[in-house]
């Protein structure tokens, strides 16, 4: 069976068991291909994380492909129909961990760049790749550290295309031009442990906190806007008690998360939470963790280039969206870069038997190449 360039490179990358944060030579494979077409290769290792910054050209504007080589753990191997790191094609679908998220997109980016450079060896500006093995994990030694390094030497990205699987029903139907912010908190409410038969000698933190938690759940934080849905508050964990039926717990721990729009700031959310907790007279401690700021790329050069390319290749009028979880775009957007996420279908990401339609790989490559044409062709 003859494989296209993109499928062949995808198969090579999918054979690497690059469970986060292990890269397992994926970046070496990519770097060797890019070096052959004139990219300057700069590996950046921080802690146990491999990162790659590759650039062709020294002038602006800079178009950057961004993505990650790490994948999530496979889960139970006996639940897979085939070895997750021995990719297989069955019924027109390519199976393997990372097939959708996001090794096939990385392959498409490399092949698209090779083809564009062959046609336009003297293209304007620069083409760059920012690849990490720390997107699926803590994301502390990956893209964020590369961006910090680039910022220190005043190396700016103009446009950034992240190859996350953005499509929903067919290739290119959705592109992400922003993401909501993510704010996490661990709330500890102090009570006084005691016997359930003597509640007057104890203070039940579950009872005391319940009205405050109910108010937090019912609060309308904002109404969203044209690009973002309303801010969402979700409690993910509650823990209290010793396991005994006759003991009033001495403390309650609640974990919750905000996915928030550009209508509010993290500081405003924190302030309102404290106001509600204080109003209910709770004795508490709260630890906040901001895991991502919201970002938005309005319609402009990058969005137009992507929409035009998708329409030309697939005939699809794409829809802009900010739904879904966080991505590494949150580290790149604050530099002033226009950021867009565009990749294959996301229906099976992180699942057993993750797969992608083989017939989407070459059109995705064509879309990426046309975006380069639209922005950097002389």
Curated annotation (Swiss-Prot):
SUPFAM superfamilies: Bacterial exopeptidase dimerisation domain, Zn-dependent exopeptidases. Keywords: Amino-acid biosynthesis, Cobalt, Diaminopimelate biosynthesis, Hydrolase, Lysine biosynthesis, Metal-binding, Zinc. Zn(2+) 2 binds at residues 101, 136, 350. Pathway: Amino-acid biosynthesis; L-lysine biosynthesis via DAP pathway; LL-2,6-diaminopimelate from (S)-tetrahydrodipicolinate (succinylase route): step 3/3. Zn(2+) 1 binds at residues 68, 101, 164. The active site is at 70, 135 (proton acceptor). GO terms for biological process: diaminopimelate biosynthetic process; L-arginine biosynthetic process; lysine biosynthetic process via diaminopimelate. Gene3D superfamilies: Zn peptidases (3.40.630.10). Pfam families: M20_dimer, Peptidase_M20. It catalyses: N-succinyl-(2S,6S)-2,6-diaminopimelate + H2O = (2S,6S)-2,6-diaminopimelate + succinate. Binds 2 Zn(2+) or Co(2+) ions per subunit. Its EC number is 3.5.1.18. Homodimer. Belongs to the peptidase M20A family. DapE subfamily. This is Succinyl-diaminopimelate desuccinylase. The gene is dapE.
């Amino acid at each position: 069976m003859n494989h296209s360039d993109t499928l062949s490179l995808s198969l090579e990358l999918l054979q690497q068991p690059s469970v986060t944060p292990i890269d397992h030579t994926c970046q070496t494979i990519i770097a060797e291909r890019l070096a052959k077409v004139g990219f300057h290769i700069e590996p950046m290792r921080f802690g146990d994380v491999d990162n790659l910054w590759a650039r062709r050209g020294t002038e602006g504007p800079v178009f950057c492909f961004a993505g990650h080589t790490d994948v999530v753990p496979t889960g139970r191997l006996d639940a897979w129909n085939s070895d997750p790191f021995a990719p297989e094609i069955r019924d027109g679908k390519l199976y393997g961990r990372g097939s959708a998220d996001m090794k096939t997109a990385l392959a498409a980016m490399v092949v698209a760049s090779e083809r564009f450079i062959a046609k336009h060896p003297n293209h304007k500006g620069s083409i760059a790749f920012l690849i990490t093995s720390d997107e699926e994990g803590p994301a502390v030694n990956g893209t964020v550290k590369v961006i910090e390094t680039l910022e220190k030497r005043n190396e700016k990205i103009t446009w950034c295309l992240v190859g996350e699987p953005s499509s929903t029903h067919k290739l290119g139907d959705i592109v992400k031009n922003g993401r909501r912010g993510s704010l996490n908190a661990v709330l500890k409410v102090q009570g006084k442990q005691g016997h359930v038969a003597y509640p007057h000698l104890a203070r039940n933190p579950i009872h005391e906190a319940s009205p405050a938690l109910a108010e937090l759940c019912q609060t309308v934080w904002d109404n969203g806007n044209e690009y973002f849905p309303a801010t969402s508050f979700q409690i993910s964990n509650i823990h209290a008690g010793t396991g005994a039926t006759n003991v009033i717990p001495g403390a309650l721990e609640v974990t919750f998360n905000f996915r928030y729009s550009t209508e509010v700031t993290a500081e405003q959310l924190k302030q309102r939470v404290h106001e509600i907790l204080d109003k209910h007279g709770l004795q508490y401690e709260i630890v906040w963790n901001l895991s991502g700021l919201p970002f938005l790329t309005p319609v402009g050069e990058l969005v137009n280039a992507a929409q035009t390319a998708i329409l030309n290749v697939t005939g699809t009028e794409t829809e802009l969206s900010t739904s879904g979880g966080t991505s590494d775009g949150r580290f790149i957007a604050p530099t002033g870069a226009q950021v867009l996420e565009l990749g294959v279908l996301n229906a099976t990401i992180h699942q057993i038997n993750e797969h992608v339609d083989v017939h989407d790989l070459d059109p995705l490559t064509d879309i990426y190449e046309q975006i380069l044409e639209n922005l950097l062709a002389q």
